[in-house]
Amino acid sequence: MEILGGPHFAVAGAGESHGPAVTTIIHGSPPGFRIRRCDVQPFLDRRRPGGNKHGTPRNEKDKVVFLAGLYRDDTDALLTGSKLTVDVDDQSFETEGYEDGFTTGEPIAAIVLSTSKKSGDYTQFSGPTGEVRPGHTDLVKFHQSKGFVDVRGGGRSSYRSTITDVIGGSVARIILRECFGTRFVSSICQVGSLKSKQSLADTLTIDNIDEIETSLGEAEIASIDHEFANEAGELIKETRKRGNSLGAAVEVVAVGVPPLLGQPLYQSLKVRLMGALGGLNAVQSCEIGSGVDVIPRTGSENNDPIRSSGYQSNTHGGLLGGITTGSPLVARVGFKPTSTINLPQDSVNKRLDEIEFELAKGRHDPCVGVRAGVTLESRMAIELLNSVLAYQATAHCGDSIKLF
């Protein structure tokens, strides 16, 4: 079974790129936290295709409807808002979704409909003579499933599946912010060979986070380095015109992180975070803290000084021995160039006959890192909340999560 997070807080999903909808089930949410649809929707808006001129031309509205796991005695407030209509056997059925309620501790269910599909664009890849796109899962998934695979838009392997990540992560970050003041922010720090001259981790504080979030939310390229963002936007535009694609790197930071979370070895929070972030579609690398920059340093240069007030620097990225220190969690995630390009390439069909492949039709992102930040934030939030609940499950009564 594929789940994100777990065992204490976990998210599961279903749905293909060109299926009717993407569904989400959230397990382990503690009771008593207020979840409003209007607080979750902005995170999906950041993720959705068509919301950024540098992304895919596919334009989905991605409006979420909550179906289970929320309640309040004021049922007008609970139900007033979203509706779901289904036509079956020449009959129409309508029901309300949950708009504003409190978690009950039961599984939370949500659905997002898929309404902007051009499935005819993918006949090129159908059946045993279907062509294989280099860099995609076409070949391995076809043979793994004995040919029973949905080729439209990548099927279940599509980035559309991350709707589930963002819904689950939205609930996790609402709970973490209410309990600890934890906040999550991301900034694009590299596109192709262009690199940002500013680091989010070096800039972000609890005091300036609202200003930075507003600035990032208004930008086409969500980077704190505006000069870099403008140059990156032009580079993406020119690369798309040439039918090619670009890689990217995204810095993800969480502030207000409780200390003492995680395990030291096989379930360390470092292992889990690197797995969650590194397992996202198209990710090729994941670094914690200063990452590979620590390699040429000496120990005296790299160790973070400690005083009674806490750590004086954060080379360790908020994790030591897989356990949080209370310093900001810092990760840098690298994405490969989008595999779908409009240029001739050597490939095969699914019977392994050699061909010269050229894309007939399709819609895709020229740089997948552009809208990946919110998904990375969401995955970090899910793993962090799972670690909080794991800590609380083994803590002595009355223990608070405190180090300094």
From Swiss-Prot:
Its EC number is 4.2.3.5. It is an enzyme of class 4 (lyase). It comes from Rhodopirellula baltica (strain DSM 10527 / NCIMB 13988 / SH1). One of its GO terms (molecular function) is chorismate synthase activity. One of its GO terms (cellular component) is cytosol. Its cofactor is FMNH2. GO terms for biological process: amino acid biosynthetic process; aromatic amino acid family biosynthetic process; chorismate biosynthetic process. NADP(+) binds at R47. It comes from the Bacteria. InterPro entries: Chorismate_synth, Chorismate_synth_AroC_sf. Keywords: Amino-acid biosynthesis, Aromatic amino acid biosynthesis, FAD, Flavoprotein, FMN, Lyase, NADP. This reaction introduces a second double bond into the aromatic ring system. Pathway: Metabolic intermediate biosynthesis; chorismate biosynthesis; chorismate from D-erythrose 4-phosphate and phosphoenolpyruvate: step 7/7. This is Chorismate synthase.
